[in-house]
């Protein structure tokens, strides 16, 4: 938020990833919004929006300068990283949902997910990575400055040594897979594929 708004946390309203909200008497995240519904996630799940963001971002200023012609879309595996940099009035914001393995959004942006997003979630769901192996890119001896594999502080409930099998420790795709997948390099590939789909379907850069 600070980087894309040019304002300090004291000015842009986003003082952390989460904090205690005195008005509601509970902990909130920077983007949680009880008035908004999640699209593409679990039924009844709380939605996300930039309603706590004060001021404008580069994306908002692009929309203003172009008379609304510019297209701004936020995409990230983290909700806050998709929502806050893209500002108050983007054409959409999408992030990964580890409960369903889908790219999701909220009713702040749409009444329903665009058809191309639904198609991506159906045809190119991260469950397709089930059983893939995450191996080192280079021979083990190359990584002389890296810490030992299976370090004492590692707390993964899955594999702790290369190669890693992306299966969440289960026999079929499910929430544990999605959580493990999110921390693997395959997630970066998946995110890039989604971004390419957004460029093609939203006519970005045209």
Predicted segments, located by residue:
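N-terminal cofactor/phosphate-binding cores enriched in small/glycine residues
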Residues: 1-6
């Amino acid at each position: 938020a600070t980087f894309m708004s040019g304002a300090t946390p004291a000015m842009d309203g986003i003082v952390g990833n989460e904090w205690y909200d005195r008005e509601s008497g509970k902990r909130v995240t920077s983007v949680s919004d009880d008035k908004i519904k999640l699209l593409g996630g679990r039924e009844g799940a709380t939605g996300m929006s930039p309603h706590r963001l004060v001021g404008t971002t580069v994306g908002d200023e692009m929309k203003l300068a172009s008379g609304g012609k510019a297209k701004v879309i936020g995409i990230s595996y983290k909700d806050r990283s998709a929502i806050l940099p893209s500002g108050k009035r983007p054409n959409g914001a999408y992030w990964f949902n580890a409960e369903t393995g889908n790219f999701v959004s909220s009713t702040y942006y749409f009444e329903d997910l665009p058809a191309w997003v639904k198609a991506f979630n159906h045809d190119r769901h991260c469950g397709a990575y089930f059983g893939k192996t995450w191996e080192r890119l280079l021979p083990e001896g190359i990584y002389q400055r890296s810490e030992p594999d299976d370090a004492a502080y590692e707390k993964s409930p899955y594999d702790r040594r290369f190669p890693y099998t992306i299966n969440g420790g289960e026999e079929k795709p499910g929430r544990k897979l999605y959580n493990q997948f999110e921390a693997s390099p395959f997630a970066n590939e998946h995110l890039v594929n989604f971004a390419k789909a957004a460029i093609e379907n939203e006519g970005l850069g045209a």
